[in-house]
Curated annotation (Swiss-Prot):
Its cofactor is Mg(2+). It catalyses: IMP + L-aspartate + GTP = N(6)-(1,2-dicarboxyethyl)-AMP + GDP + phosphate + 2 H(+). It is an enzyme of class 6 (ligase). SUPFAM superfamilies: P-loop containing nucleoside triphosphate hydrolases (SSF52540). The active site is at 13 (proton acceptor), 41 (proton donor). Homodimer. It comes from Sphingopyxis alaskensis (strain DSM 13593 / LMG 18877 / RB2256) (Sphingomonas alaskensis). GO terms for molecular function: adenylosuccinate synthase activity; GTP binding; magnesium ion binding. This is Adenylosuccinate synthetase. It holds the Pfam family Adenylsucc_synt. It is found in: Cytoplasm. Belongs to the adenylosuccinate synthetase family.
Length: 429
């Protein structure tokens, strides 16, 4: 049986939630492998709308859902999200949900530090969600983190607290903040420990068993390749690797488990927060894309920046992440445009580039080279086969496929799960 890894091929917010939900109904396990509760997914199932930030999308369908070791976990955010979903009738228990016991925790002072840094940065801020993701990853890499398994040993936490407070109290002092209240922190952890430990286990072992049984595993990425700590628009990136290879290291399975890599890309481009955006439209066209696409962040509610499809960026994302096929989403947002543009290259100080440069100053300076196509005025909303699409919409899909040098495997034409045109089944490979 084939496994499938779903990743964002742009700056996140590509519609991964709908695609993962669609695939999860055919998977035996769904795994989150990086990020934290900074990655919002909106799922629409019938009349019910589910907003997830931390839990794998498979939880809504009752599929075994796993938070892998590559995720940083806010235990209080976890409890809030589970409580909300249970209120919507979703069943969550230790049989269908598991957390890696070696996950690093996001703690209250991580959120504090995130907010303090963003405020101090002023106009130079990164645009984080302020949820402590970056500082938690810093502590993980710095070997200071408190992990899920430590919640079962809170009476022996002193050495870790010494390392944590020595680091963070110095940072807090620089911002004029008081030291961490160790007693309160331990009390808060005692209060939440049993709740988290109910789901904690060596998930690599459970996944090994699932894989050995020939079951289908769906790896659910968060954010997008252009926010990858190495391959993204550094420093305007997230704090983890978002490329497909992280599915292996972030879950406890080897690289052979990654399977079919399905990249998700909107039929246009959006970005939330700061950072370079070559095709950004700050005119009526950009506003129209945002309004038609309802472009507001699931987690922050921030308005997303909008622009034309950038084939250079998506082609690069596909290359560095080994994308097997693309799911093109929100095609219906382009309905009604007389002319549609696609970025096919860049100009940078008199030179033509067919790739996105690494240096921040170069990224900010590139000018898009556009190819124009006729648009279409018929509706694509709800289309479920190529026969339902206008001829120009099909030409657009084909041209995108040529430019990104990667096959289009799926086309999504609305937030509804069934409104999907399947060209190549990821699970059949």
């Amino acid at each position: 049986m084939a496994n499938v890894t779903v990743i964002g091929s742009q700056w996140g917010d590509e519609g991964k939630g709908k695609i993962v939900d669609w695939l999860a109904s055919r998977a035996d396990a769904v795994v989150r492998f990086q990020g934290g509760h900074n990655a919002g997914h909106t799922l629409v199932v019938g009349e019910q709308v589910y907003k997830l930030s931390l839990l794998p999308s498979g939880i809504v369908t009752g599929t075994l859902s796993i938070i892998g070791n590559g995720v940083v976990l806010d235990p209080w955010a976890l409890r809030d999200e589970i409580t909300k979903l249970r209120g919507q009738g979703v069943e969550i228990n230790a049989d269908n949900f598991a957390i890696a016991d070696n996950c690093a925790l996001i703690l209250p002072f991580h959120r504090d530090l995130d907010a303090l840094r963003e405020t101090a940065a002023g106009a130079g801020k990164i645009g984080t969600t302020g949820r402590g993701i970056g500082p938690a990853y810093e502590d993980k890499v710095g070997r200071r983190a408190i992990r899920v398994c430590d919640l079962a040993h809170l009476d022996h936490l002193e050495p870790q607290l010494d390392r944590l407070t020595a680091h963070h109290d110095a940072l807090r002092a620089g911002f004029g903040e008081p030291p961490i209240d160790r007693d309160k922190l331990v009390a808060d952890l005692r209060e939440i420990a049993d709740y988290v430990l109910e789901y904690a286990q060596p998930v690599w072992k459970r996944l090994k068993k699932v894989r050995k049984a020939g079951a289908r595993i769906l790896f659910e990425g968060a954010q997008g390749v252009l926010l990858d700590i190495d391959h993204g628009t550094y420093p305007f990136v997230t704090s983890s690797n978002t490329v497909s290879g992280t599915a292996a290291s972030g879950s406890g399975l080897g690289p052979g488990a990654v399977g079919f890599v399905l990249g998700i890309a909107k039929a246009y481009t959006t970005r939330v927060g700061s950072g370079p955006f070559p095709t950004e439209l700050e005119d009526e066209t950009g506003q129209r894309l945002g309004e038609r696409g309802h472009e507001f962040g699931t987690v922050t509610g921030r308005k997303r920046r909008c622009g034309w499809f950038d084939a250079v960026l998506v082609r690069q994302s596909c290359a560095v992440s080994g994308v097997t096929g693309i799911a093109l989403t929100k095609l219906d947002v382009l309905d009604g445009f007389d002319t549609i543009r696609i970025c096919t290259g860049y100009r940078l100080r008199g030179k033509i580039l067919d790739y996105f440069p690494a240096h921040a100053a170069d990224q900010a300076a590139v000018e898009p080279i556009y190819e124009e196509m006729d648009g279409w005025h018929e509706s694509t909303a709800g289309a479920r086969s190529y026969a339902d699409l206008p001829a120009q919409a099909i030409k657009y899909i084909q041209r995108v496929q040529e430019l990104i040098e990667t096959p289009i495997a799926l086309v999504s034409t609305s937030p509804e799960r069934e409104d999907t045109i399947l060209i190549r089944d990821p699970f059949s490979d």
